[in-house]
Amino acid sequence: DGPAPLTGLALARRIAHTTYRSPAELEHRFGREENRGESTVGGSLGEPRGRYAIESYLDHHGAKLVERFDANSYLAVNEALISHDVARGRGTLAQALAHTDCEWTIAAVNTDRLFFPHESHRLAEALPTPVPVDIIESNHGHDGFLIEAKQVEKILARALGVEDESATPSEAQREREALDSMTR
């Protein structure tokens, strides 16, 4: 309800986006590069300065989210994520998971700064029957699970029991999906 916190949503997205990618990737892509034709050295206090390329990149992602996502809904989703606790009222994590009877597949990105691999191992160890954690090797941080399609494909194919090549998406289909995701 009420006015949407659009500026705050864009800023939150800028900050969050720095955790979706690894420091190594951001350094490789942007380093200390200035926007073309701009100097990042300001004259005096309060005088405008040029911007770094990373700032434009982050602004772009902030503006993109504001255009496609309701800011108040974003607040509600964030609250749900922050307050969720599978063990609440059930004791420890192991006690909460003790009666699960599904098959689990757990994967982690080695450079993820949102969901650290050790947390995935903790989850796997808390299951009634521990399962291995598949580690996705990526220089892309959290978004590695979106970018490292071949690794994720193998993990999912094994989990679904469709490890033969005919059951996996074709290269052309993967390229179409990648292009679609870039234009969203």
Please name every model-derived segment.
Residues T7, V66, S73, A96, ...:
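Secondary-structure capping and boundary motifs in well-ordered enzyme cores
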Residues D1-K64:
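Alpha/beta-hydrolase-fold enzymes
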Residues N110-D112, S138:
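Acidic beta-to-alpha connecting loop that harbors the catalytic carboxylate
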Residues H121-A124, P130-R184:
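Catalytic active-site module of serine/aspartate enzymes centered on a nucleophile-bearing elbow/loop
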Residues T100, I106-A108:
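Short beta-strand/loop motif that positions the catalytic acidic residue
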Residues G89-A94, C102-E103, R113-A126:
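Short alpha-helix in the alpha/beta-hydrolase fold that links the catalytic acid
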Residues N72-E79, K154:
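Feature representing long, continuous alpha-helical segments
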Residues H60-H61, A76-A96:
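Active-site nucleophile elbow and catalytic-triad environment of alpha/beta-hydrolase enzymes
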